[in-house]
């Protein structure tokens, strides 16, 4: 029985799943938007949002926790210098999932997962409005 088991298996063993979400979390922190399947995007929220919450308080202990979860010093630096201060007043909900159709090969539902309030999105809207 699977009582009280949370999270999706995604047809992977636990170490593969953990490595995949660690890599995806690093990618979304670096690029602030990535394209993936809807199921992976929904699970990725559970990894990324606590990292950003951790980054709101810049301390050595929090940086070490973030590094233990991402294993990437560049990502930890961006979390604590850019993303933590950006989301300081927001009490959660740092990501947005936008569905974008089906994948060509296998018709898997795809989605963009992005960080809310990313600067590129605001600039793109202003450019389109000006045209």
Curated annotation (Swiss-Prot):
Gene Ontology cellular-component annotations: cytosolic large ribosomal subunit
Highest taxon of the lineage: Bacteria
Gene3D superfamilies xref list: Ribosomal protein L17
Keyword tags: Ribonucleoprotein, Ribosomal protein
Single GO molecular function: structural constituent of ribosome
Biological process per Gene Ontology, one example term: translation
Record flagged with keyword tRNA-binding: no
Keyword Nucleotide-binding attributed: no
Record text on subunit structure and interactions: Part of the 50S ribosomal subunit. Contacts protein L32.
Family membership noted in the UniProt record: Belongs to the bacterial ribosomal protein bL17 family.
NCBIfam families documented for this protein: L17
Record-linked PANTHER family: LARGE RIBOSOMAL SUBUNIT PROTEIN BL17M, RIBOSOMAL PROTEIN L17
Protein name, UniProt field: Large ribosomal subunit protein bL17
Organism: Shewanella frigidimarina (strain NCIMB 400)
